[in-house]
Amino acid sequence: MTNIGLIGTKIGMSREFFPIGISVPVTVIKIEKGRVIDLITKDKRGYDAVKVGFGKIKPSKLTKSMKGFYSKKSTEPKKYLKEYRVENISNFKEGNEIGLEIFKDVKFVDVTSKSIGKGFAGVMKRYNFSGLGASHGVSVSHRSGGSTGQRQDPGKVFKGRKMAGHMGDKIRTMLNLEIIKSDLNNDLIYLKGSIPGSKNTLVFLKNSVKKINKKTILEKNKIVEKQDKKQEKMSVTKEKITTKVEQKKEEIIKKVEKKV
């Protein structure tokens, strides 16, 4: 298992059907293949890491520092640079291409993207406040947040107080999203459930940090298929037994009739 991640764009949502009788909502992500730009060793910084570049960028949009960095490299400039720490740096070389194959044996991933911006919102929408009373002395402040401070001491509003403000448009991470399937030919990955952001949102994927002992839908599907096969075998054996019993009954009846 590797700690290297990938970058993609959210295409949209769909639905996958399984023989168990379950339909699962999935998010489809188009993966951008990465390329190893630089290798960082313990001699340089005290740890082993790999710098991976994603996406195309015009040379005119590069900063002077990035132009100097890429002038020493044999690879073409990339729009995004991500650094991933690895255990065995000998497995990587500059210019190596990295794609969906790194998630071949991975069941769950962590996804980071920017949520949809919802503009300026009040506390009832933003934080699910109940608001003030509909009557009984309340006038023109039914949806307000109420008191935000105390009195002369401390004489200020503390930082982090839940108040009206800009809602959404923030970087959010979803943990342990199940990989339903991956299409290596078209660089598509299907994740269970939804992820933050609208269509064409930039998405960062990485191996799940929290390890969970949870059966995936595919594993559950296999278990159900095995159970169905066992039931089929049991039904076949029952039919065979019933046919044999009936045959023996007929034989006994025939013998009795002959004696009579």
Sequence positions of predicted segments:
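Extended basic (Lys/Arg/His-rich) segments that typically form rRNA-contacting surfaces
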Residues: 1-260
